[in-house]
Amino acid sequence: MTELKNDRYLRALLKEPVDCTPVWMMRQAGRYLPEYKATRAQAGDFMSLCKNAELASEVTLQPLRRFPLDAAILFSDILTIPDAMGLGLRFSTGEGPIFDNPITCKADVEKIGVPDPEGELQYVMNAVRQIRKDLNGDVPLIGFSGSPWTLATYMVEGGSSKAFTKIKKMMYAEPQTLHLLLDKLADSVIEYLNAQIKAGAQSVMVFDTWGGVLTPRDYNLFSLQYMHKIVDGLIRENDGRRVPVTLFTKNGGMWLEQIAATGCDAVGLDWTINIADAKARVGDKVALQGNMDPSMLYASHDRIREEVASILEGFGHGGTGHVFNLGHGIHLDVPPENAGVFVEAVHELSKPYHQ
């Protein structure tokens, strides 16, 4: 594989010295960029874009042409696994993802198998291979998956949810059915992420978007234990380099110690936690990724720089191990120039912390 020209992101995840704090943005390839909208229109619809390796690579690289980002993230969706399990995924305008065949009972869970990453999900691996080729070693490529709990919420609810009543009903009335589903999903995620690593992903991230809706006990039982299983099952070295893994639970600030104890390399933070507190709690064990509120990108350029400075100061001088990011995905109507101000501010204002 091509030599990596910028490995700042990988080094920070492994708490190795860097010249400045690396930065990337969740959903950096997306609807806030006019060029993304043009490519998506060319593809026809969202899943067609995901399934076309050349176009998926094009949208992955678009933000890198605009901003000096330190990593690229695979353009895909967390729902590729349940889609490959035959749940009939479609995207409805204004409603988000819908599954025509949701999971409603134990028999539904027993019917589904672990998808073959080089079979039903080969289009994802083709995209990874294409992106690595097109990146030409400029920056590392991040692969990703949803967490078992988060995938299960969509599969049982039949789409997005605000109250999570269907999955919580299953969790409390039929816990064994839900555990069976989560176990299959954990096995699927392990195979899926390992295939991404073999195809060229140099780091992987697990998005636990909905872990924060659980009680502390249920978080450990129904979300964290399955992410722990994934961390244990991942390829951690490839191409002569460590493959770092980041776990991110949105609204997971109360569980940082438990997340750090899984053996992951980094913990993603949302904006509801102070990064100085997070560092004091788990900074000796793991790197931290985050954690500016994505809505801050609506602010003036000066205010964005001020917020970046404040988060950098919060992480402080004590060693490396910070990957700057937003606390969740960038909003679709953020002015692209504000994202540029953010990225450049991170590089410029972080240099004194790394001397």
Curated annotation (Swiss-Prot):
Substrate binds at residues 27-31, 46, 77, 154, 209, 328. It holds the Pfam family URO-D. CDD domains: URO-D. Disulfide bonds: none annotated. It is found in: Cytoplasm. Keywords: Cytoplasm, Decarboxylase, Lyase, Porphyrin biosynthesis. It comes from the Bacteria. GO terms for cellular component: cytosol. GO terms for biological process: protoporphyrinogen IX biosynthetic process from glutamate. Its EC number is 4.1.1.37. GO terms for molecular function: uroporphyrinogen decarboxylase activity. This is Uroporphyrinogen decarboxylase. It comes from Vibrio vulnificus (strain YJ016). The lineage of its organism: Bacteria, Pseudomonadati, Pseudomonadota, Gammaproteobacteria, Vibrionales.
